[in-house]
């Protein structure tokens, strides 16, 4: 629950044994906690159904996909708090799953990568649980995609590809509650000055993507911290 709102989730199991809730040989299952992409505005658990099913089958993990609320009906921080609430329920054992709490990985793509990174920052701040691993797939981590962006990938790849710099600015405007949100590290995780005590992290970027350089920069800063 996020307040009075029950956050919907969808579960994917790698086997019938996992679905039955019985640990195999006494061992519980690793879990991928997945936040989908879509600019905080589009997409859904249903749109990522096949992706999550394949992840469960190919990795042997239980996959938990979160149906967080979307902008513009729900602005920052509502989608983030929905994701945090789902993560807290999983990490604190409130969900009846044969899940190993020491083998939970938070994963998300694009806006979902933003939410995954922000959930880890928020978890460190609140101290209610702490993820051990995160996978950020071409994450959206910055707060500016105009000509003022310091990242070369925004200038080089901001036009002519599926995701444009103009689209990213549109998504940010729809997600923010006010322009002040753009200075909040939970809105744009790359703004966080202290990246110590964060989970082990894998970041995947795409060469011809405006998000490329911010993902690589975030990875280097995590490594240095």
Could you tell me what each predicted segment is?
Residues 4-225:
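Alpha/beta-hydrolase superfamily serine-hydrolase fold, recognizing
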């Amino acid at each position: 629950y996020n307040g009075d709102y029950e956050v919907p989730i969808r579960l994917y199991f790698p086997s019938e044994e996992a679905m039955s809730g019985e640990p195999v040989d006494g061992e519980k299952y690793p879990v991928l906690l997945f936040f989908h992409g879509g600019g905080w505005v589009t997409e859904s658990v249903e749109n990522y159904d096949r992706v999550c099913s394949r992840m469960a089958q190919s990795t042997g993990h239980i996959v938990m996909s979160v149906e967080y609320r979307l902008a513009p009906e729900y602005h920052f921080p509502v989608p983030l708090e929905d994701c945090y609430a789902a993560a807290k329920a999983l990490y604190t054992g409130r969900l009846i799953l044969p899940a190993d709490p020491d083998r939970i990985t938070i994963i998300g793509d694009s806006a979902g990568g933003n939410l995954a990174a922000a959930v880890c920052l928020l978890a460190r701040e609140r101290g209610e649980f702490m993820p051990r691993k995160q996978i950020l797939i071409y994450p959206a981590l910055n707060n500016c995609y105009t000509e003022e962006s310091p990242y070369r990938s925004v200038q080089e790849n901001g036009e002519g590809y599926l995701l444009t710099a103009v689209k990213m600015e549109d998504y940010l405007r729809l997600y923010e509650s006010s322009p002040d949100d753009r200075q909040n590290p939970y809105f744009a995780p790359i703004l966080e000055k202290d990246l110590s005590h964060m989970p082990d992290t894998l970041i995947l970027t795409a060469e011809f993507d405006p998000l490329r350089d911010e993902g690589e920069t975030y990875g280097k800063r995590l490594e240095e911290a």
